[in-house]
């Protein structure tokens, strides 16, 4: 998947090990998925699954999972809706000549994500958790990565203050997710 872990299955497994993979009872059919890949529409089509984890001030990062793509439940008082405490990154998954899926320098994305979080008083996501969340989703939704050389699959890691709280302070509860957009 990355230049450092692609040829080392043990390293990749170690990164994805903390993530529980939940069943998806309604994935896109092969035919539907292929038709969506063949006609890219950036930001309008999403893959079958997403990664999700939570952070609380008392417990830190927990509940690492790959789950079916679905709307997020959010309290109307969530801090992100009132104070815009949110950050995101973007990276692309592409099909390598040998059929494997690779990402370009995801460690650099992880470092930028940490810096963005720090500036917004959000908790810094450990680099291994960032890489593990992306790797777990790549493994689960590998069939969404196009085989045509000119196409890639865009991945969007994002974090937001999900705690229902109106006031100015660092959040006590945060959600982090990675979803995959259509081919670009």
Where are these regions (language model features)?
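Conserved alpha/beta cores of soluble small-molecule-handling proteins
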Residues: 1-184
